[in-house]
Swiss-Prot record:
Entries under Gene3D superfamilies matching the protein: 3.40.50.880, P-loop containing nucleotide triphosphate hydrolases
UniProt xrefs under SUPFAM superfamilies: Class I glutamine amidotransferase-like, P-loop containing nucleoside triphosphate hydrolases
Domain spans labelled GATase cobBQ-type: 249-436
Pfam family, one: CbiA
Source taxonomy: Bacteria, Pseudomonadati, Pseudomonadota, Alphaproteobacteria, Hyphomicrobiales
Name assigned to this protein: Cobyric acid synthase
GO MF annotations in UniProt: ABC-type vitamin B12 transporter activity; catalytic activity
InterPro entries tied to this protein: Class_I_gatase-like, CobQ/CobB/MinD/ParA_Nub-bd_dom, CobQ_GATase1, CobQ_synth, GATase_3, P-loop_NTPase
One GO BP annotation of this record: cobalamin biosynthetic process
Catalytic residues, chain numbering: C331 (nucleophile), H428
Pathway as given in its UniProt record: Cofactor biosynthesis; adenosylcobalamin biosynthesis
PANTHER family reported for this sequence: COBYRIC ACID SYNTHASE (PTHR21343:SF1), DETHIOBIOTIN SYNTHETASE (PTHR21343)
Length: 482
């Protein structure tokens, strides 16, 4: 039976996901069969698994780091926010409900069984299970019926290492404060801590490090400097969307929708040396000198159509198009480009019909059945293969479908306007296909690099593991697992 170790954080976006990925690669290189696990995740950035379900994108990256296929057991409970107070609840890869926050709180006790079932199945297949927590165990208001952090750790008897983010400031108060506010039995599960995202000379933090050890009685496993190549790895949280710019390069803009989903579609583009990827934030105008505007996926197509219009982006898009610019809509963005989006059954919210942007002559009707599959398609314009996945509800049809974006099993997929400058597709992950990406950028007169995307991700994972091995007591961490 496998051993297990849990990585929890002093807060969100402290680096838990990347540390688990780096440890997974490091321990896999030692010859261990490592499997990642996150009991509960909240993300609209999902990956399609080999068993036909969906999990958080971070667990898919961790699986890649461990050299295994992603599986629904790696993330048994996935919450996909649709509004500020409600989310789709996905269990073992399949949607079971849409619940408001209080409704979900009432569901959690019944979900612990599903979490433990998945955990036990992974343990039966692994030498080591690396568990990632969610948010912070310091949120004691959520401790009752918790399945994500200490509730799981104690039920499954998994030791915990806590990650603190020094880049935000206040890391001493974060870690010492957690020891102060959580239940003593929960605190006893924490065996140590790691300081993450340090910039500069780590010896300057020696006194702070010793103070944390003294105040908490937890063992320190090291100070991890800022990892410069983190931007080369897919990010799961919208917080991770980069504002890094490349002045003088060809601009591609992406709209930062309020319910943006599967934005890792952008990752291969941002790594292209000749592409200056601009995230257009709420309240900002779409720059007038971009060659392509991408409308990304959304967890709430009609809601984000209203959000898009509230920013004035509909007017900006029309101006961009009239100047000769190109537009690409992916999944929910594809639906928005059409003449209308109808939701007669209220799948995404109140039933109704919302006018689209009208840049494609298609209409979308939402339906309860969800398409969730990995696919191999062929780009219609260049005949290049595309390895991708679909994860959407709704069906789109109309005259512009006569000019498909791609062919999928011999059938048309997506739509293109009569002048070829507006394109829509349900294919996610399409830009990871190197030959297609190069052909697509070439048509926009943007030079593309030759380095394969997946090779770059693999290289970054190896570098992350090297970085962790150099700065943390990795053997000490492994010795904690039980």
């Amino acid at each position: 039976m496998a051993r297990a170790l849990m990585i929890q954080g002093a807060g969100s976006d402290v680096g838990k996901s990347l540390i688990v990925a780096g440890l997974a690669r490091a321990f896999t290189r030692r010859g261990l069969r490592v499997l990642p696990f996150k009991p509960q995740n909240m993300s609209n950035n999902a990956a399609v698994t080999v068993d036909g379900g969906e999990i958080g994108r971070a667990q898919a990256l961790q699986a890649l780091a461990a050299g295994v296929e992603p599986h629904t057991d790696m993330n048994p409970v996935l919450l996909k926010p649709e509004t500020d107070v409600g989310a789709q609840v996905v269990v073992h890869g399949k949607r079971i409900a849409t619940a408001r926050a209080r409704e979900y709180a009432a569901m959690k006790p019944s979900l612990m069984g599903a979490v433990l079932e998945s955990f036990e199945r992974l343990k039966a297949r692994a030498d080591l299970v690396l568990v990632e927590g969610a948010g912070s165990p310091a949120e004691v208001n959520l401790r009752k019926a918790d399945i994500a952090n200490m509730g799981f750790a104690r039920k499954a008897d998994v030791p915990v290492v806590l990650i603190g983010d020094i880049d935000r400031g206040g890391v001493i108060a974060q870690l010492v404060g957690i020891k102060t506010v959580i239940d003593p039995d929960d605190a006893a599960m924490i065996q140590g801590f790691v300081i993450n995202k340090f910039r500069g000379d780590p010896t300057l933090f020696d006194d702070g490090y010793k103070l944390i050890e003294a105040k908490t009685a937890w063992r320190g496993f090291g100070v991890l400097p800022w990892f410069a190549r983190a931007g080369e790895l897919p990010a799961e949280d919208a917080l991770g969307l980069s504002d890094a710019r490349k002045p003088g390069q060809c601009k591609i803009a992406c709209l930062a929708l309020s319910r943006i989903a599967n934005f890792d579609d952008l990752d291969p583009l941002k790594l292209e040396a000749a592409v200056d990827l601009v995230m257009v934030r709420p309240g900002e105008a779409i720059p007038g000198d971009v060659r392509l505007v991408i409308i990304p996926g959304s967890k709430s197509t009609r809601g984000d159509l209203a959000f898009l219009r509230a920013q004035g982006w509909d007017i900006d898009l029309l101006a961009h198009y009239r100047r000769g610019g190109h537009v690409l809509g992916l999944c929910g963005g594809y639906q928005m480009l059409g003449r209308s989006v109808a939701d007669p059954d209220g799948i995404e919210g109140p039933a109704g019909d919302t006018p689209g942007l009208g840049l494609l002559d298609v209409q979308t009707v939402m339906s309860p059945q969800k398409t969730l599959t990995r696919v191999t398609a062929v780009h219609a314009a260049t005949n290049q293969p595309i390895q991708a996945y679909e994860i959407h509800i709704g069906r789109t049809d109309g005259p512009d479908r006569a000019r498909p974006f791609a062919k999928l099993n011999g059938e048309p997929e997506g739509a293109i306007s009569s002048d070829g400058r507006v394109q829509g597709s349900y294919l996610h992950g399409l830009f990871t296909s190197d030959d297609f990406r190069k052909a697509f950028l070439t048509k926009l007169d943007i030079p593309a690099g030759d380095e394969p995307y997946h090779s770059r991700v693999e290289s970054a994972l190896d570098a992350l593991a090297d970085h962790i091995e150099k700065h943390l007591d990795v053997e000490g961490l492994l010795s904690l697992a039980r």
